[in-house]
Amino acid sequence: MIVQFVALLLLNLLQIIAAESSHTNNWAVLISTSRFWFNYRHTANVLGIYRSVKRLGIPDSQIILMIADDYACNSRNLFPGTVFDNADRALDLYGEEIEIDYKGYEVTVEAFIRLLTERVPENTPASKRLLTNERSNILIYMTGHGGDGFIKFQDAEELSSEDLADAIEQIHQHKRYNEILFMVDTCQANSLYTKIYSPNVLAIGSSEVGTSSYSHHADIDIGVAVIDRFTFSNLEFLENRVDSKSKLTMQDLINSYNPYEIHSTPGVQPINLRRSPDDILITDFFGNVRDIELHSEKINWMLPGENTTKPSIKRNSFVFQAQNDMQDDGKGFGISNLKSFLPPTRELKYKKHPISRIISAVVCISFSIGFPYYASKYLK
């Protein structure tokens, strides 16, 4: 019995190690639930986060952007077609080729729940669907007006903490995520994640139960506040300290929160999380998994028969020789040594887990020794 228990324990350890290496793609669901001109800052909040995740590599195809009102085209906007999150108006958040997937009255509690649970009509385009799998990390960022255990949508309906928790559990049961970062900027934000019970969720809120979240500053010409303090704190960290190769962790971001500057007490709740925030890179949620390098250098390719001498191909100051292997014998373009001619491709390297091999060996030995004894004694 002891051998059997040890074997099961080791199998569980193997599953944990495998799960930690299963993260292959990142998705972001970014939503501003408010409408009306005086809530301009909520759209600026979400567009600021949207810009950060795009800068760090998440493509629009893996970002669901939901904005409940069109402030860029509002008749009160002194700067038509723009949205700013700073009074200096140095960066137009609406001019970054944004792709809004749900807007106006499309942004409802029902639409949000259907998006998370993939209970959408069959003809719903991919841009309006959360096409995640068990290897997906999901960032869910919400901003708007809220209260104890709810957040308002369109100033007409509410999403409760219970409904949110049940939706996340459905995602879990259908194996549609690896880990979730739930971040919310609203009054009494921390109450919105108290009912979540699904595993591997890191929840961060802007304010405690019974307290409000506050705007950071206003633009005199626009006439309203342009960003909230909690989101401003996050963007200040992300934009100034994080790039696509950053090794900063979620704990570093959490440690940067200053309640005195934010004017509220942010909350952090790891919910059945298998990793510590110290071990979770910020780019595990805000960046792209693939490390993509863009090259602007021109490559002088030679057509067959143009030059029979050894052509050189320059790429990143490295010279590759085709070794006269380019031939055109009338039967088509042939290269006898393709690797010597083509530009190099970077080999994909995956993290190895040597401990898993040791554990596997121990499990096999345990079974080979323990099972015959167990069978002879209990299975007669």
Curated annotation (Swiss-Prot):
It comes from the Eukaryota. One of its GO terms (biological process) is attachment of GPI anchor to protein. Its EC number is 3.-.-.-. It is an enzyme of class 3 (hydrolase). One of its GO terms (cellular component) is endoplasmic reticulum. It is found in: Endoplasmic reticulum membrane. The disulfide bond between PIGK/GPI8 and PIGT is important for normal enzyme activity. The active site is at 145, 187. The keyword NADP does not apply. Residues 1-19 form the signal peptide. GO terms for molecular function: GPI-anchor transamidase activity. Pathway: Glycolipid biosynthesis; glycosylphosphatidylinositol-anchor biosynthesis. Keywords: Disulfide bond, Endoplasmic reticulum, Glycoprotein, GPI-anchor biosynthesis, Hydrolase, Membrane, Protease, Signal, Thiol protease, Transmembrane, Transmembrane helix. The chain crosses the membrane at residues 355-375. Residues 376-380 are cytoplasmic. It holds the Pfam family Peptidase_C13. InterPro entries: GPI_transamidase, Peptidase_C13. Glycans are attached at residue 307. Residues 20-354 are lumenal. Mediates GPI anchoring in the endoplasmic reticulum, by replacing a protein's C-terminal GPI attachment signal peptide with a pre-assembled GPI. During this transamidation reaction, the GPI transamidase forms a carbonyl intermediate with the substrate protein. This is GPI-anchor transamidase. It comes from Schizosaccharomyces pombe (strain 972 / ATCC 24843) (Fission yeast). The lineage of its organism: Eukaryota, Fungi, Dikarya, Ascomycota, Taphrinomycotina.
